[in-house]
Amino acid sequence: GYPKLEAEYRLYDPETGITGDFDGIVASDWPTAYAAWRYERDVPRLYWVQDFEPFFFPAGPDYVVAENSYRLGYQGIACGPWLAGKVTEAGGMPCAFYDYQVDSSRYTRTNDSHRDEIFFYARPTTARRGTEFGLLVLEEVHRRRPELVINIAGWDMSQAGLNFPFVNH
């Protein structure tokens, strides 16, 4: 990746905070945004935003704290234009973005023909994924279109007792 990069790596200690003489700080999620905000020197602060983190939580304190991290005065760098706009709208943080990346030598679309299949990413342990609602929808899809192959990945659903046939990936 970065053969000429020379950087120091330190584990963060909340008791001492960020110490040292740095030219800038990059936060990469909401807890690191607050840690970097506590740094006493006046240096540029960037916030590398990879997800809209408030959506990781139901409405409540964690949602608010995550959303407020976009109001700390950073310059944001986001993965894609939607996320950059969402962060600016939610917290007022100016946010540049970079385009999504893919290694097309490894990941390609190999089947462009019509298929009677549907794919669902199920992760029941992660509330924001809405697995319960998705499974209810798939049950109705199967009732209306029993010829569709339903593919489920993300979690082993083989023992979930679902009321429709599916391919467990």
Residue ranges of model-derived segments:
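Membrane-proximal helix-turn-helix segments that form the acceptor-binding/catalytic region
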Residues: 13-21, 55, 59-77
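Active-site proximal beta-strand in glycosyltransferases
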Residues: 24-27, 39-56, 77
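Alpha-helix capping/helix-boundary segments
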Residues: 31-32, 53, 82-84, 157-158
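Acidic anion/phosphate-binding donor-loop and adjacent secondary structure
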Residues: 54-60, 96-116, 161-162
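N-terminal pre-catalytic "stem/leader" segment of glycosyltransferase-like enzymes
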Residues: 1-21, 146-149
